[in-house]
């Protein structure tokens, strides 16, 4: 799957639905959806991660989530990049509690997770932002609490009126630490995004090996800037 270079930083809502930019993301989502439509589970979880730092990665994940929501899928987008969060700003949402605060809770309940979700201006799309990342230490709690949070998010997606639900995670780069690997071990599918001319074969190989050690289900890739 590929997306040509055309301001990946911008949200799809800034473009005409018939534009090549928009069509590229619809093609990407169609391929993602094809990979899980045969699954009997109506709620699906996935991670889109890049091997090395890429500033437009958050925009790529946001646009895939937008297409999913526009297709009628109840979609929850999670900003799990607790180092450089940006999704709340991209959707023009004010500061609010998010993933960092949930990870700091002694007991995580569906009610607490639901209260942390923000509605976006796009129907069917809600955001769990990174929250206040200045407190530090949140990443250390991912391994012990992420499974509970994902189960709550899955159930919240199931409560929507649409027939299918999707939870999409945005994470730090795979090779920058353990966060992406921890998330990939908990979600059903992981896709690697690679940037032509920037992402090297060595980085891709190292990222694949790291994800495989986490028992991630790596099912595909997205090529940017071709």
Per-range role (PLM):
Residues 2-26, 30, 37-45, 51-54, ...:
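P-loop/Walker-type NTP enzyme "switch/lid" segment
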Residues 32, 52, 132, 171-173, ...:
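Short, well-ordered turn and helix-capping elements at secondary-structure junctions
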Residues 60:
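Hydrophobic positions on the alpha1 helix immediately C-terminal to the Walker A/P-loop
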Residues 63-64, 138:
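Short amphipathic alpha-helix
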Residues 68:
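Aromatic pocket-lining residues of Rossmann-like dinucleotide-binding sites
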Residues 139-226:
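Conserved catalytic-core segment of NTP-binding enzymes
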């Amino acid at each position: 799957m590929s997306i040509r270079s055309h301001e990946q930083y911008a949200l799809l809502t800034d473009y005409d639905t018939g534009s090549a930019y928009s069509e590229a993301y619809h093609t990407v989502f169609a391929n993602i959806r094809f990979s899980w439509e045969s699954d009997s589970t109506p709620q699906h979880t996935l991670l889109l991660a890049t091997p090395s730092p890429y500033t437009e990665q958050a925009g790529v994940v946001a646009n895939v989530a937008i297409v999913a929501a526009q297709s009628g899928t109840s979609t929850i987008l999670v900003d799990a990049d607790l180092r450089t969060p940006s999704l709340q700003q991209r959707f023009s949402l004010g500061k609010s509690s998010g993933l960092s605060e949930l990870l700091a809770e002694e007991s995580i309940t569906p009610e607490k997770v639901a209260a942390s979700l923000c509605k976006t201006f796009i129907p069917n799309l809600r955001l769990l932002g990174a929250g206040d990342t200045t407190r530090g230490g949140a990443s250390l709690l991912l391994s012990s609490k992420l499974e509970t949070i994902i189960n709550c998010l899955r159930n919240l997606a199931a409560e929507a009126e649409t027939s299918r639900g999707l939870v999409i995670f945005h994470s730090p780069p795979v090779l920058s630490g353990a966060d992406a690997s921890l998330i990939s071990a908990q979600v059903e599918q992981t896709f690697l995004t690679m940037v032509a001319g920037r992402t090297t074969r060595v980085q891709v190989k190292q990222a694949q090996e790291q994800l495989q050690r986490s028992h991630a289900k790596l099912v595909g890739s997205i090529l940017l800037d071709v």
